[in-house]
């Protein structure tokens, strides 16, 4: 079972605890999986435990002895002291298990950056870090679940389902209990109760952001880090807090790694990056991306245990490999900031339906100041205010997403043209639910990214997705979180003076269309999609072949085609 993932190392350790056997695998260069054993219990932990020192101190104050400094020992003592609720206290990127008697508890981190999968067999319950490991233990090595594979392609995969037959995903922020012949899965984190629970002014929110973000950044630093630096606001925000303290703490500067595009000027952000590293004194390494989305596709869909939508694993692997070559074990990125501080959909309707008239008036005045007439302001707010049956009917009539769906895809597979799932909710709940959507659903993209990184010997850290920072962001009142029409305005205000004004005042956003289109591999698309016998229901292959012959995909059509190629590669390689 452990041997099914040789990229995790060949140092194998197993321990029998009653009727349960726990095993870990490690690479000599990076031991990130630990095992703790007591006479009647055991624990395993895979990943990074950011707050181990704080937890150990709290346990010792309670009179509990922590056997050693490994994360597994901390988890062991925590479960012994606080039970399964101790998982709520853990911070970091992880999956793990605790065994006592006949019961085993498997757990996964709040946001789902660590991985955990499970399945049932006649002999009982099996769980592992990777789906392929569970698949092997079930006697169904790498057997695809064709229905689930199609669901992945069309974006409708159920949260617990995977692309491998018989293998279940443990959802983020969840734990699974197995004992006495039963298996139950339960969530341990319920962030919905936090939404708009704080009453803070904008100045207080900016101060609170700096406090929480500084803690989030500090937690991720190891002394062997590389920051993937862009010219936006997200990764520069990490640089602003990490770089000044990095050299005093670790004796060298925080290294930045940036992709440059000399042949695609519309994509290149070098001038912004240069301004950041000059102000913060960061060593910079640049590279010209060479990987394309379908490079070595069969290998990657095998490693990631399924096709991945949207994310280009070869391109991620390229920068992780370069980071490792720079000596990094931890790769910092500003990813997911948009889910924490940018989702403002249905803001006007939320303010109106909750009678926050002053904030609503300020929002309308801000739109008017951009030159929009009152009719445009009303149209902007109307869908958020309309009852579900009215809003849904209106958007279906508009069918605006026709340009996002290729003509060779049956619209019925995605719920029909114009379907807006957010508008199917009660109008009063739409903004609140939008703040939480990123914490729901199957997490196949971040799982695939984690497996890619693990295969290259690094962890990917996303300070903006730190649990305490995310909880703080959820707690902010809507009008404080989004005080004006400027994206991430709160972050820009908080970082004024810490980053160049060139970055904080930047209003444009880099579009990567030119780079995406340059990476189109029509020969690979034809090889994987057309030449094989497998067919996905709802895809018009004759029409798709005609489009491939023309070799003139737009960005969205190319992304759909790449996703379909990964589906075919995954099914055919089985």
Go through each PLM region and give its residues.
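Short Ser/Thr-interspersed hydrophobic loop/turn segments at strand-loop and sheet-helix junctions
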Residues: 21-31, 110, 438-451, 473, ...
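ATP-dependent adenylate-handling active sites, centered on carboxylate activation for C-N bond formation
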Residues: 61, 102-105, 110-116, 120-122, ...
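PAPS-dependent sulfotransferase catalytic core
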Residues: 345, 499-555
């Amino acid at each position: 079972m452990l041997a099914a993932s040789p990229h995790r190392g060949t140092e194998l350790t197993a321990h029998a605890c009653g009727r349960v056997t726990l095993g870990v695998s490690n690479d000599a260069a990076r031991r990130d999986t630990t095992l703790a054993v007591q006479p009647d219990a055991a624990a395993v932990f895979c990943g990074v435990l950011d707050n181990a020192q704080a937890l150990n101190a709290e346990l010792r104050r309670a009179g509990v002895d922590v056997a050693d400094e490994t994360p597994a020992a901390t988890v062991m003592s925590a479960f012994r002291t606080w039970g399964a609720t101790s998982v709520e206290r853990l911070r970091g990127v992880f999956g793990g298990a605790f065994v006592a008697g006949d019961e085993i508890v498997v757990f996964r981190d709040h946001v789902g950056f660590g991985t955990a999968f499970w399945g049932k067999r006649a002999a009982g319950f099996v769980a592992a870090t990777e789906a392929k490991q569970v698949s092997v233990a079930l006697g169904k090595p790498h057997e695809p679940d064709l229905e689930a594979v199609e669901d992945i392609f069309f974006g409708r995969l159920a949260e617990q389902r995977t692309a491998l037959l018989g293998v279940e995903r443990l959802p983020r922020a969840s734990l699974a209990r197995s004992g006495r012949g039963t298996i139950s899965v339960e969530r341990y984190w319920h962030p919905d109760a936090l939404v708009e629970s704080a009453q803070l002014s904008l100045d207080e929110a900016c101060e609170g952001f700096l406090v929480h973000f500084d803690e989030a950044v500090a937690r991720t630093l190891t002394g062997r880090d590389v920051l993937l630096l862009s010219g936006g606001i997200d990764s520069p925000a990490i640089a602003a807090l990490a770089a000044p303290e990095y050299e005093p703490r670790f004796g060298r500067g925080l290294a930045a790694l940036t992709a440059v595009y000399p042949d695609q000027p519309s994509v290149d952000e070098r001038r912004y990056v240069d301004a950041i590293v000059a102000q913060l004194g960061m060593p910079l390494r640049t590279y010209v991306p060479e990987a394309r989305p379908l490079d070595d596709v069969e290998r990657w869909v095998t490693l990631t245990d399924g096709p991945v939508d949207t994310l280009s694993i070869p391109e991620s692997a390229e920068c992780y490999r370069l980071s490792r070559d720079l000596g990094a074990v931890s790769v910092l990125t500003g990813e997911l900031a948009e889910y924490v501080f940018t989702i403002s959909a249905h803001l006007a309707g939320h303010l109106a339906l909750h009678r926050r008239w002053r904030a609503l008036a300020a929002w309308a005045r801000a739109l008017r100041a951009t030159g929009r007439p009152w009719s445009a302001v009303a149209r902007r707010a109307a869908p958020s205010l309309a009852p579900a049956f009215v809003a849904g009917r209106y958007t279906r009539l508009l069918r605006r997403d026709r340009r996002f769906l290729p003509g060779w895809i049956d619209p019925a597979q995605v719920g029909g043209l114009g379907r807006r799932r957010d508008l199917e909710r009660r109008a009063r709940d739409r903004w609140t639910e939008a703040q939480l959507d990123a914490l729901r659903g199957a997490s196949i993209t971040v799982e695939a990214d984690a497996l890619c990184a693990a295969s290259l010997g690094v962890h990917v850290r996303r300070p903006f997705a730190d649990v305490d920072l995310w909880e703080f962001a959820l707690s902010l009142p809507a009008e404080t979180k989004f005080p004006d029409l400027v994206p991430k305005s709160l972050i820009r205000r908080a970082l004024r003076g810490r980053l160049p004004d060139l970055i904080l005042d930047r209003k444009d956003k880099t579009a990567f269309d030119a780079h995406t289109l340059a990476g189109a591999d029509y020969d690979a698309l034809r090889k994987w999609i057309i030449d094989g016998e497998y067919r996905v229901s709802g895809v018009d292959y004759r029409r798709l072949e005609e489009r491939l012959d023309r070799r003139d995909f737009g960005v969205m059509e190319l992304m759909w085609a790449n996703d379909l190629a990964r589906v075919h590669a995954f099914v055919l390689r089985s």
